[in-house]
Amino acid sequence: MSTFIGQLFGFAVIVYLVWRFIVPVVGRLMSARQDTVRQQLADAAAAADRLAEASQAHTKALEDAKSEAHRVVEEARTDAERIAEQLEAQADVEAERIKMQGARQVDLIRAQLTRQLRLELGHESVRQARELVRNHVADQAQQSATVDRFLDQLDAMAPATADVDYPLLAKMRSASRRALTSLVDWFGTMAQDLDHQGLTTLAGELVSVARLLDREAVVTRYLTVPAEDATPRIRLIERLVSGKVGAPTLEVLRTAVSKRWSANSDLIDAIEHVSRQALLELAERAGQVDEVEDQLFRFSRILDVQPRLAILLGDCAVPAEGRVRLLRKVLERADSTVNPVVVALLSHTVELLRGQAVEEAVLFLAEVAVARRGEIVAQVGAAAELSDAQRTRLTEVLSRIYGHPVTVQLHIDAALLGGLSIAVGDEVIDGTLSSRLAAAEARLPD
């Protein structure tokens, strides 16, 4: 019995403990769980509502999308049709432009081909004509006939006047021209009293003084001061050269500095010119003027075809004495004997180049020699040597045209083919066959 009561008491204690401590906790847990379930049910209901709303929104969005897609498709179709029309119109315009451009290009190509054909035909015609002319003038008689025909044409030309003047005068202004003319006239009278040795010495001394004045620019400037009283200038030249030159040379220098010169260099040119006149006076007394002129022109042509020799003789960096030695060696090796007057004239010219090209200076010297006799120099180009009759006739015709004696300097150039080319000063009469062929070729279309 006591066992039963003890167990009952223990059970009662357990029940009490469960009711007192466990039941409240479990109750609270159950209540919290119920609240959680109720909240989840509420959330589920809200989610169901949102799902329904989303479904409705989706359905509406699909309908809106279909409507928008239909609208976009319609707009795209309309734009495509409009673009297609624009492209078609643009294609028509472009096709028309290309067609017109193609037509213009065809016309241009046709014109170019036509012009090229004409040009080639013209060049071929000129080439054939040149070949025919070359074959024709291969016969010396036919080539000589071309010269005769040109002389006939030249003979029919209207006369023209030409003044024979010292070439140096063309380089000077009026004051120097008057001074040089007066000096040369005075020297012509004064030279009659000088013998061969006197003229030779005079020429050499004048060249030495000219070289001195070329080096002493200040002295030259004082000697050409344009003052009315020439006494100071005469005294200066006397102090400068007295005892160094002979009396004739000193007299020439006194006369030269007493003149009025337009430029300082004109005085030096005048002194050099008088020295040349002294040597040419020697040639004239010996009856060798023609030989001197011919040798001077021949040496001028040698310089034209030997540019290296011209460069060596005209190199002012080399002392004048060295260039003169070279000149004399060249002249000593010449096939024929060179006239001593020519040697002296060329030597003096090389000494007094003063920056001028030697070939130009020698040609100028030859023209001075010709002008001394009152003659005109005619530079004549021919394809072959002229006969004596043709040369005589040419000289007579040119003398009649220009109203003065003419000296003919002949230059042979086979490239001229036929006819003659004549240059008198700045005037050129070109009647060569080569020039006519060149003129025909120049008239061809570009």
Swiss-Prot record:
Signal peptide: none annotated. Keywords: ATP synthesis, Cell membrane, CF(0), CF(1), Hydrogen ion transport, Ion transport, Membrane, Multifunctional enzyme, Transmembrane, Transmembrane helix, Transport. GO terms for cellular component: plasma membrane; proton-transporting ATP synthase complex. Pfam families: ATP-synt_B, OSCP. It is a single-pass membrane protein. F-type ATPases have 2 components, F(1) - the catalytic core - and F(0) - the membrane proton channel. F(1) has five subunits: alpha(3), beta(3), gamma(1), delta(1), epsilon(1). F(0) has three main subunits: a(1), b(2) and c(10-14). The alpha and beta chains form an alternating ring which encloses part of the gamma chain. F(1) is attached to F(0) by a central stalk formed by the gamma and epsilon chains, while a peripheral stalk is formed by the delta and b chains. The gene is atpFH. The lineage of its organism: Bacteria, Bacillati, Actinomycetota, Actinomycetes, Mycobacteriales. Its main location: membrane. It is found in: Cell membrane. The keyword Amino-acid biosynthesis does not apply. PANTHER family: ATP SYNTHASE DELTA CHAIN. F(1)F(0) ATP synthase produces ATP from ADP in the presence of a proton or sodium gradient. F-type ATPases consist of two structural domains, F(1) containing the extramembraneous catalytic core and F(0) containing the membrane proton channel, linked together by a central stalk and a peripheral stalk. During catalysis, ATP synthesis in the catalytic domain of F(1) is coupled via a rotary mechanism of the central stalk subunits to proton translocation. This is ATP synthase subunit b-delta. Residues 1-168 are annotated as: ATP synthase subunit b. GO terms for molecular function: proton-transporting ATP synthase activity, rotational mechanism. In the N-terminal section; belongs to the ATPase B chain family. Residues 169-446 are annotated as: ATP synthase subunit delta. The chain crosses the membrane at residues 4-24.
